[in-house]
Amino acid sequence: MAKTSKFTQTLLASALAVVAGSASAAAFQLAEVSTSGLGRAYAGEAAIADNAAVVATNPALMSLLKQPEISVGAIYVDPNINLTSPMPGFAYKNIAPNALVPTVYGVYPINEKFAVGGGLNVNYGLATEFDDKYAGGFLGGKTDLTAINFNLSGAYRVTEKFSVGLGLNAVHAKAKLERYAGVALKLKVPNVAQLAALPANTVISKLQGDKWGFGWNAGLVYEFNERNRIGIAYHSQVDINFKGQYSNHFPLAAAALLQTKGITATGGKEIPGTLHLPLPAYWEISGYHKMTDRFAMHYSYKYTQWSKFKELRAKGTDGKTLFSKTEEFRDSSRIALGASYDVTDALTVRTGIAYDESAADEHNTISIPDTDRTWFSVGATYRFTPNVSIDAGFAHLKGKKNTFKEEGVPFTSKASANLYGLNVNYRF
């Protein structure tokens, strides 16, 4: 099959890193696994057993829960990402829509040593949206990716102080992407008469598909005493092998000339293809230290193996490479520090700060304007009864200003986001 367009490379690259926008972690990883964690910027996430949400990060923590428990909630993400450019028509405000990230978890202690649990959370996913008449439609149109993680885990208390956990992950990923002609296409492919007549909102590339991927996770917890413990969690890479359809509305009359520019015209016809999307492995180490009867400190260091992702390669059904695009992501780190205070037996307040490092190095795009970001978080838990409680959390994310070029067009992106979380916990 012939080589696809430079635009198509940008399109499928967006499928890889769509969630980077502003929502949470580096590249296309989401951090929003619990509302209680949100309130402390996820500091101590692999060592704190607030509720059944421990399933999402460190399954070994299930050994600390003494009663069956469920946790249900959601985090509302309100991003604000703006682009500026010295080129007329390429600036754009609010490229990422709001989103709701749901979470559902349950833990069931079988006896003093064994516990099982499961959960559902969105660990990858966001969207970027540009108007179909945007001048840079060739670079940024509509991108939507959701990766829902289903987890089943078990925990075993090896000794009075040491526990281990193991889990299986099934991830269902669904992607839909569109790009438009805009004016950038004519700049990129000049002197093609048939393109001059294309309206800016002409769909020049469309891709959609869904697929399952599978992985595993493990964790351990060591309790020095009732007030101090550390936890380590590891989540394996999950490989998603998308199978979907690609099409564009380039006129077939211009096919031969477009081919010299590296563009395959389909005239609206769909072409089947595959795309490998790796969701990288990561590990996290956390600590929890109760300094007084009411005050505790907690911290985390998280390391994600983005450097495993070297390139993005799409293939046709005949096995031939449609394109290969160098990504060269770098490993990223996240550090977080938080504190909790029990105001009363019924009310706990918490706060945290975190620094989240970008995984993108030299390959930023307007669909994925990844950048370093700082978290500022506050939250609280209120216990109505010993068995019923609610968590509330808020975080403000401030991204570092980022200047880059895509296809020769200069851009500067500024990103921030507000996250609002609410969760209900019930013990049986």
From Swiss-Prot:
Where would you find this protein in the cell? Cell outer membrane
Q: What is the protein name for this chain?
A: 47 kDa outer membrane protein
Q: Which UniProt keywords apply?
A: Cell outer membrane, Membrane, Signal, Transmembrane, Transmembrane beta strand
From the UniProt annotation, give the residues forming the signal peptide. Answer: 1-25
**Annotated membrane topology:** Multi-pass membrane protein
Which molecular function term from Gene Ontology is one that the record holds?
A: long-chain fatty acid transporting porin activity
Q: In which organism is this protein found?
A: Pasteurella multocida (strain Pm70)
Q: Name the family.
A: Belongs to the OmpP1/FadL family.
* A GO term from the CC aspect: cell outer membrane
